[in-house]
């Protein structure tokens, strides 16, 4: 993704006026100790179709590299991320509860840091939701969306993964 952004920023294009640049809200989201920012990419709309296609494929390659990075950062990072994503998208309970909101923040931290450890300090994230909530939430989603090993049950997977991110070490 960094490569794709570098290519886009090198495109040039018509510079925007200061007033136009100030109209954009650069902060997309803020949670925990993180802030997600958006950037204007001047000239993107002026790229040829071939250049936009290149940007697309570079972005797809970056997404595949992200999974490799997750896997290299911790043995169970990819499994945990996929379980959390399955709950985030398929949870059938109340998404306004403090446990679900805490799980959402935890997932976003996992996305940002490519795993269950802080991207700078390397300390393990402590989730704000209970292991009971996690097990119940995992059981509420479609099993086909979970990263189950061959022959593994939903209960077994939830029981195996819960201590991996809910214990301090």
What is the meaning of each model-derived region?
Residues 12-14:
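Bacterial signal peptide processing site
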Residues 6-10:
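C-terminal motif of bacterial Sec signal peptides marking the signal peptidase cleavage site
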Residues 1-2:
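Sec-dependent signal peptide recognition
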Residues 17-20:
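N- or domain-start disorder-to-order transition segments that initiate the globular core
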Residues 22-169:
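N-terminal helix-rich structural modules
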């Amino acid at each position: 993704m960094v490569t794709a952004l570098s290519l886009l920023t090198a495109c040039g294009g018509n510079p925007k006026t200061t007033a136009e640049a100030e109209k954009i809200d650069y902060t997309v989201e803020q949670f925990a100790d993180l802030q997600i920012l958006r950037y204007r990419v001047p000239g993107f709309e002026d790229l040829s179709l071939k250049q936009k296609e290149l940007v697309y494929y570079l972005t797809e390659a970056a997404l595949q590299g992200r999974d490799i990075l997750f896997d290299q950062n911790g043995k169970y990072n990819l499994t945990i991320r996929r379980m959390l994503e399955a709950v985030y998208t398929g949870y059938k309970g109340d998404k306004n509860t403090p446990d679900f909101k805490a799980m959402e923040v935890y997932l976003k931290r996992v996305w940002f840091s490519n795993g269950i450890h802080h991207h700078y300090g390397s300390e393990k994230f402590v989730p704000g939701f209970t292991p009971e909530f996690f097990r119940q939430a995992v059981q509420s989603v479609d099993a086909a969306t979970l990263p189950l090993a061959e022959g593994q049950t939903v209960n077994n997977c939830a029981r195996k993964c819960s201590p991996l991110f809910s214990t301090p070490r």
